[in-house]
Regions:
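Short, structured segments at the rim of ligand-binding sites
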Residues: 1-146
Length: 146
């Protein structure tokens, strides 16, 4: 889809890139890291995502890379995301949801991708997001449960 508006991630004055990391309450919720990561794939600019609190929560990024996202998994806790700036779309694919957090990120990626994606093990997403298909459909998403 063609986009007229977008969003930019701005580097710091010294040229270093923005880093987003999770922390205990009242800090940034670790449950939102995967959503921020997939959203950053379409931004203008780069961001370092740092998952400090949990091991291996970023291991779903290989699925996003398969879809065309520019992500470098630095280690089990950090991923560098280079945004597309809506210049290229993610590509549809078949994938499996490993858990709730990764599943919702993959669902967001699938909704923004060109083509039809299929997410296996979607029950993982249901555990954290009640009636997600119906709620997204009400917002205008082209989504169905098969």
């Amino acid at each position: 889809p063609e986009h007229n508006d977008g969003y930019s991630i701005v580097n710091f004055i010294d040229g270093s890139i923005l880093s987003i990391s999770d922390s205990p309450w009242p800090g940034f919720s670790p449950d939102l890291i995967s959503i921020i990561l997939v959203t950053a794939t379409q931004a203008n600019g780069s961001v370092l995502i740092h998952q400090k609190m949990f091991e291996s929560r970023l291991f779903f990024v290989d699925k996003l890379i398969d879809m065309g996202a520019k992500i470098i998994l630095c280690d089990p806790h950090r991923a560098s995301v280079i945004g597309h700036n809506f210049k290229s779309s993610l590509k549809a694919t078949n994938m499996t949801s490993p858990d709730i957090r990764a599943g919702i990120a993959l669902l967001i990626a699938a909704l923004s991708a060109n083509g039809v994606s299929v997410i296996q093990n979607a029950e993982q997403i249901d555990r954290g997001y009640e009636d997600i298909v119906e709620r997204l459909r009400e917002l205008g998403a082209d989504i169905e449960r098969i």
